[in-house]
UniProtKB/Swiss-Prot annotation:
Residue intervals of the Ketosynthase family 3 (KS3) domain: 1-402
Enzyme Commission code(s) on record: 2.3.1.-
GO biological process: antibiotic biosynthetic process; fatty acid biosynthetic process
Tagged with keyword Transferase: yes
Miscellaneous comment text of the record: This putative ketoacyl synthase lacks the active site cysteine.
PANTHER family per the UniProt record, alphabetical: POLYKETIDE BETA-KETOACYL SYNTHASE 2-RELATED, POLYKETIDE SYNTHASE-RELATED
Protein known as: Actinorhodin polyketide putative beta-ketoacyl synthase 2
SUPFAM superfamilies: Thiolase-like
Molecular function as annotated in GO: 3-oxoacyl-[acyl-carrier-protein] synthase activity
CDD domains xref list: CLF (cd00832)
Family statement drawn from the similarity comment of this UniProt entry: Belongs to the thiolase-like superfamily. Beta-ketoacyl-ACP synthases family.
PROSITE patterns reported in the protein's UniProt record: KS3_2
Length: 407
């Protein structure tokens, strides 16, 4: 059974919607800049990937506005766009034949911080009743399923930056178990003081003040990453079911998925990223020689970049495959990062061009990777590998294949 991606919805700092985002990525235009939603002058980090051109009332019903955090509003919008793109009308499909699987790493930080201020300053009676679910990691799954009447198997996953790929992998398993269509992906937003402090506490956030030089994975100047908001929601379908409803094309196939967990620090055992890569390739029934491009996790932290480069090198050989990190144009989007990379990979497969790693210029020779720099690289890729790692040991990998219509 093939699991196809038939629709995508993108909400990114450098583009709302697929076409603006893809154009920005190819041009190397980033959406990074100073945080403007609160005063960051007292904080060591001041840059983020903000979505500044999103006006929620233009995209979701007014009744949902008081119920939802910014991350959920973005997720609902992306889901709407993905379903429209897939030409899938939920009202014409059986409710139990549609599921929702999303990932979330931050929860409803903005909503909850606001309600906590009310609690502390005005008392418990001032707290919104919607706080009971607006903060929760599973809220995007719930709101999407309610909005579109999707009553099939649904769930939520939490694995920081790796969670979005995990969600897509679980959606694929759900389809293979008999659910014809699953809406899946990840969106995060935590650009409020409470969320900002939590992110800075990781010790991995860039303190640079120049957006052009703040997030440089695999570069000699790498010194942390820039966090961002947004992500992507995708429509995944069983190929036969998609064709039965009249959908005869797709962005590509989700051919393989795998997740691993790193051993305890100091154990002496190897990290799990290489194993995740090999498991995903095995799941896809393909070998390293068939992979045409790797969309790397690209932590932007020197020791993490070096570890990822070693894992890629052990699987593919020194400079054995083109590698790219288009997320330098958006920042790291936590659960939204993996699904957005999947969309970028699918577009690369469809358009025959590998998106570049914007901003990076000086890759240490010892990394031994063929990083795509400066300009898009025109090729004819057929298979892509997407990687993601989350704090505390999460590793995920996904294999994508170019769509091949049935003769």
């Amino acid at each position: 059974m093939s699991v196809l991606i038939t629709g995508v919805g993108v909400v990114a700092p450098n583009g709302l919607g697929l076409a603006p985002y893809w154009s920005a990525v190819l041009d190397g235009r980033h959406g990074l800049g100073p945080v403007t939603r609160f005063d960051v002058s007292r904080y060591p980090a001041t840059l983020a990937g903000q979505i500044d051109d999103f006006h929620a009332p233009d995209h979701i019903p007014g009744r949902l506005l008081p119920q939802t955090d910014p991350s959920t509003r973005l997720a609902l919008t992306a889901a709407d766009w993905a379903l429209q793109d897939a030409k899938a009308d939920p009202e014409s499909l059986t409710d139990y034949d549609m599921g929702v699987v999303t990932a979330n790493a931050c929860g409803g930080f903005d909503f909850t911080h606001r309600e906590f201020r009310k609690l502390w300053s005005e008392g418990p009676k001032s707290v919104s009743v919607y706080e009971s679910f607006a903060w929760f990691y599973a809220v995007n799954t719930g709101q999407i399923s309610i909005r579109h009447g999707m009553r099939g198997p649904s769930s939520a996953l939490v694995a920081e930056q790796a969670g979005g790929l995990d969600a897509l992998g679980h959606a694929r398993r759900t389809i293979r178990r008999g659910t014809p269509l699953v809406v899946s992906g990840g969106v995060d937003s935590a650009l409020d003081p409470w969320g900002w402090v939590s992110q800075i506490a990781s010790g991995r956030i860039s303190t640079a003040t120049d957006p052009d030089r703040a997030y440089l994975p695999f570069d000699e100047r790498a010194a942390g990453y820039v966090p961002g908001e947004g992500g992507a929601i995708l429509v995944l379908e069983d190929s036969a079911a998609a064709e039965a409803r009249g959908r005869h094309d797709a962005y590509g196939e989700l051919a393989g998925c795998a997740s691993t967990f790193d051993p305890a620090p100091g154990s002496g055992r190897p990290a799990g990223l290489e194993r995740a890569i090999r498991l995903a390739l095995n799941d896809a029934g393909t070998g390293p020689e068939d992979v045409d491009v790797v969309f790397a996790d690209g932590a932007g932290v020197p020791e993490l970049d070096a570890a990822e480069a070693r894992a890629i090198g052990r699987v593919f050989g020194r400079e054995g495959v083109p590698v790219t990190v288009p997320k330098t144009t958006t920042g790291r989007l936590y659960s939204g990062g993996g699904p957005l990379d999947v969309v970028t990979a699918l577009m690369s497969l469809r358009e025959g061009v590998i998106a570049p790693t914007a901003g990076v210029t000086s890759v240490p020779r010892e990394y031994g990777i063929d990083l795509v720099l400066g300009e898009p690289r025109s090729t004819a890729p057929r298979t892509a590998l997407v990687l993601a790692r989350g704090r505390w040991g999460f590793n995920s990998a996904a294999v994508l294949r170019r769509f091949a219509p049935t003769p």
